[in-house]
Amino acid sequence: MGEEVSIGATAVGIKTKEGVVLAAEKRVSYGFYTLSTAGKKVFIVNDRLAIASAGIIADMQTLAKILKLNAKAYELEMKRKPSVHAMAKLLSVVMFSRRFMPFFAEVLVGGIDDEGPHLIVMDPLGSLIEDNYAALGTGAKLAIAIIDASYKPDMSLQDAKKLAVQALKAALERDPVSGGGIDLVVIDKNGAREEEVKLQVLI
């Protein structure tokens, strides 16, 4: 029998009154073997919506593509952008339909719509939980401890971004299968924008 192999990744999301921050580290690992330090785990769906994920890169990319195509189709047909909950529900249905051969990915759906900012946490079977902040993946316990200690509902989006980076750095330092730099997406009323935080590599 083959030995069990952990798929490493850590992603976090933080919601504020101004918007949402999604962030993930960039290392792609298989067990304790690093395949790449430039893996993309944060994806912009449109200028109001993005996802961050932990799991297998191929499954993350597939889910992101499904969401992008359906968001665009909805916008073309309805002449308006879909709500965050509508897109999360669609993704939930897709993931649940594969429950006997599930996607190996946990997903954070973040965005802003007419009802305000939203952060939705999804497990590989598509369960939906809306929360103010969350962490997924192998470094989740380390990251969530940092966010728990510093999160404030009235914090600024800039402070939320700093907290997300701080949480991921904590995970990167102690989780052997997380690492590389950090990709972020910041979503507010002005749109969604990507940023990258490069980290010093310690050997």
From Swiss-Prot:
GO terms for biological process: proteasomal protein catabolic process. It is found in: Cytoplasm. Its EC number is 3.4.25.1. InterPro entries: Ntn_hydrolases_N (IPR029055), Pept_T1A_Psome_bsu_arc (IPR019983), Pept_T1A_subB (IPR000243), Proteasome_sua/b (IPR001353), Proteasome_suB-type (IPR023333). It catalyses: Cleavage of peptide bonds with very broad specificity. Signal peptide: none annotated. It is an enzyme of class 3 (hydrolase). Disulfide bonds: none annotated. NCBIfam families: arc_protsome_B. HAMAP family: Proteasome_B_A. This is Proteasome subunit beta 2. The lineage of its organism: Archaea, Thermoproteota, Thermoprotei, Thermoproteales, Thermoproteaceae.
